[in-house]
Amino acid sequence: MKKISLLFLICGLFLVSSCIPTQTIKGDGNITTENIPVSEYDCLELEGGGMVVNYTQSDAPEGLEIKTDRNIFEKYEFNVENHKLKIRPKKEFRKHTNFRPTEFMVTANSRNLKKLAAAGSTHVNINSPLQAEEFEAGLAGSGIIQFHDTASFTNLKIEIAGSGDFVGHKVYCEELNGDMAGSNTIVLGGTVGIAEFSI
């Protein structure tokens, strides 16, 4: 059921992000940096174009910093619901809108991370060692999820639809399950006990 739920989530985000846009909103060049208070979360749901996310697993209190054009910032929402940090356009801009920010940098940290779902052309960098019993990563569109340090899991699930890439050169897990649809790539290094892929 978890696998099906994540597939529905990333495919749903992909459908939203891949609709033919009726309007394009370009960044106005007025770059602003905002620190947004957030409650505890262990899941990231990301949707948008041109977003670069830098995540760190840390014992420090949860934090979120957004750096982007003022007119882009005003059309996005940033909130935590049921331990899920959601970064996405406001409801009236989720369909038929193409965002072209001058810059869209997200810096986030939390104590735990169990699930990551990204849609659109989002580039997610995991910049610290990451540990979790179970971890689910979902990509829809042309995004990238990249682990820059050691990642250790008991169970790892990777699901990609579109032309996205998953990269991790120091991944250690007992069991790996991967689902790939489209012209995507999974690049892994490290040690895996059991691996199963559906292509």
Model-flagged regions — what are they?
Residues 1-199:
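Intrinsically disordered, low-complexity terminal regions
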